[in-house]
């Protein structure tokens, strides 16, 4: 093992809670590596969120030298002072595409309900064109347990050319349910 290297500094949400709700939003950085033979082979990627002082922002950092140095954070979604992004996940395809998923409240003017979003970078994590995965809204307080816990279980992976995502969803109005969706890449 090498000596630890500082990747980046993040701020957690006030009281570790999602604003406008009582839901906890712990920060679980997710790391991936480009194992392709492409232009960004060997690049390490980490997705996380940080508190900007006004909202939670999902960001990706990357290292092209085995983790010795790290890039400045790149926002995955368009910056805004009005909506939160949280519970990100990341994976790298066999061809070097960087896939990120997260929950996003950009389409709720009250910044409460969320939808699932994804972004796939084909330029080594420099840009992340966004794709909205769900049309219906989920309310983070609709969890059935009454204890301000919606689950923090999001994830994604690649199956050949397909990017597969899983997230918590309460758009049916009852307890949280895991939902799986796929984005076919052509």
In which residue ranges do the predicted regions lie?
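Extracellular, repeat-based ectodomains that mediate carbohydrate processing or recognition
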Residues: 1-186
């Amino acid at each position: 093992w090498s000596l630890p290297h500082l990747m980046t500094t993040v701020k957690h949400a006030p009281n570790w809670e999602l604003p406008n709700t009582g839901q906890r939003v712990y920060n679980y950085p997710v790391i991936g590596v480009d194992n392709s033979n492409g232009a960004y082979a060997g690049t390490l990627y980490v997705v996380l969120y940080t508190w900007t002082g006004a909202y939670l922002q999902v960001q990706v950092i990357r290292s092209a030298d085995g983790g010795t140095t790290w890039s400045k954070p790149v926002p995955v979604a368009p910056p805004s002072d009005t909506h939160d992004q949280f519970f990100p996940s990341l994976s790298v395809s066999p061809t070097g595409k960087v896939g990120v998923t997260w929950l996003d409240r950009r389409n709720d003017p009250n910044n409460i309900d969320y939808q699932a979003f994804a972004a796939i970078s084909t330029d080594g994590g420099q840009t992340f064109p966004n794709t909205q995965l769900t049309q219906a809204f989920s309310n983070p307080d609709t969890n059935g347990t009454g204890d301000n816990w919606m689950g923090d279980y999001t994830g994604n992976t690649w199956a050949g050319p397909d990017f597969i995502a899983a997230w918590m969803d309460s758009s049916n109005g009852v307890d949280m349910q895991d939902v799986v969706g796929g984005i076919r890449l052509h």
